[in-house]
């Protein structure tokens, strides 16, 4: 998980 405009799941 990243924080910002778009969040991506941590894989």
UniProtKB/Swiss-Prot annotation:
It is found in: Secreted. Pfam families: Periviscerokin (PF08259). InterPro entries: Periviscerokinin (IPR013231). GO terms for biological process: neuropeptide signaling pathway. Keywords: Amidation, Neuropeptide, Secreted. The modification Threonine amide is found at residue 11. GO terms for cellular component: extracellular region. Disulfide bonds: none annotated. Mediates visceral muscle contractile activity (myotropic activity). Belongs to the periviscerokinin family. This is Periviscerokinin-1. It comes from Polyphaga aegyptiaca. The lineage of its organism: Eukaryota, Metazoa, Ecdysozoa, Arthropoda, Hexapoda.
């Amino acid at each position: 998980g990243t924080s910002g405009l778009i969040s991506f799941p941590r894989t």
